[in-house]
């Protein structure tokens, strides 16, 4: 078993992608860094390219061991769902290109792991992330969701180890 593991949690979006790096060492979770990417570009393809470049920079800077990525959930309409899916694909590609394994989590699973209900609001998730990491949440809601994904994954890893499945 590794002495520590670093996970990047990512909440993909075509307009704002939240990311958060959490490290677990000896059962203690620590916030390493977090932020939000608001891709720029003249058109959607250019924004996806910018999202890739910015996220790749984050991955290179922090060298996470694994990535926990929020899966696509129900969107307002088909066009929104397609754009979200494309942004998520860019996120997965940026991680994979840097050798970071990607684990997918449904939003309801992440929310339930942090708040106790799969229908929690973003504000509730952000509050619980702050409680778990011992910090005051002053980040964007998408960043809180990304940190929640990382925490959810680290908890899942711990449970898998305890159950003797890993």
UniProtKB/Swiss-Prot annotation:
GO molecular function: crossover junction DNA endonuclease activity; DNA binding; magnesium ion binding
Cofactor descriptive note: Binds 2 Mg(2+) ion per subunit.
Top-level enzyme category: hydrolase
Reaction catalysed by this enzyme: Endonucleolytic cleavage at a junction such as a reciprocal single-stranded crossover between two homologous DNA duplexes (Holliday junction)
Record keywords, A-Z: Cytoplasm, DNA damage, DNA recombination, DNA repair, DNA-binding, Endonuclease, Hydrolase, Magnesium, Metal-binding, Nuclease
Residues involved in Mg(2+) 2 binding: 70
Any Gene Ontology CC annotation: Holliday junction resolvase complex
InterPro entries reported in the protein's UniProt record: RNaseH-like_sf, RNaseH_sf, X-over_junc_endoDNase_RuvC
Keyword hit for Cytoplasm: yes
Subcellular compartments: Cytoplasm
Domain of life, per lineage: Bacteria
Location of the active site: 11, 70, 142
Pfam families, sorted: RuvC
Complex and partners: Homodimer which binds Holliday junction (HJ) DNA. The HJ becomes 2-fold symmetrical on binding to RuvC with unstacked arms; it has a different conformation from HJ DNA in complex with RuvA. In the full resolvosome a probable DNA-RuvA(4)-RuvB(12)-RuvC(2) complex forms which resolves the HJ.
Function according to Swiss-Prot or TrEMBL: The RuvA-RuvB-RuvC complex processes Holliday junction (HJ) DNA during genetic recombination and DNA repair. Endonuclease that resolves HJ intermediates. Cleaves cruciform DNA by making single-stranded nicks across the HJ at symmetrical positions within the homologous arms, yielding a 5'-phosphate and a 3'-hydroxyl group; requires a central core of homology in the junction. The consensus cleavage sequence is 5'-(A/T)TT(C/G)-3'. Cleavage occurs on the 3'-side of the TT dinucleotide at the point of strand exchange.
The name this protein goes by in its record: Crossover junction endodeoxyribonuclease RuvC
Organism field: Nitratidesulfovibrio vulgaris (strain DP4)
Lineage: Bacteria, Pseudomonadati, Thermodesulfobacteriota, Desulfovibrionia, Desulfovibrionales
């Amino acid at each position: 078993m590794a002495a520590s593991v670093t996970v990047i949690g990512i909440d993909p979006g075509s307009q704002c992608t939240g990311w958060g790096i959490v490290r677990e060492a000896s059962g203690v979770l620590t916030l390493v860094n977090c932020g939000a990417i608001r891709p720029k570009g003249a058109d959607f393809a250019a924004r996806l390219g910018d999202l890739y470049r910015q996220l790749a920079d984050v991955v290179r800077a922090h060298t996470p061991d694994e990535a926990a990525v929020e899966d696509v959930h129900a969107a307002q309409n088909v066009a929104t769902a397609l754009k979200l899916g494309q942004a998520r694909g860019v996120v997965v590609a940026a991680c994979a290109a840097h050798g970071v394994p990607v684990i997918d989590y449904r939003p309801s699973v992440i929310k339930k792991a942090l708040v106790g209900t799969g229908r929690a609001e973003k504000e509730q998730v952000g509050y619980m992330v702050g409680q778990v990491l011992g910090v005051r949440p002053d980040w964007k809601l998408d960043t809180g969701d990304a940190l929640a994904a990382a925490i959810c994954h680290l908890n899942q890893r711990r449970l898998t180890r305890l159950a003797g499945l890993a």
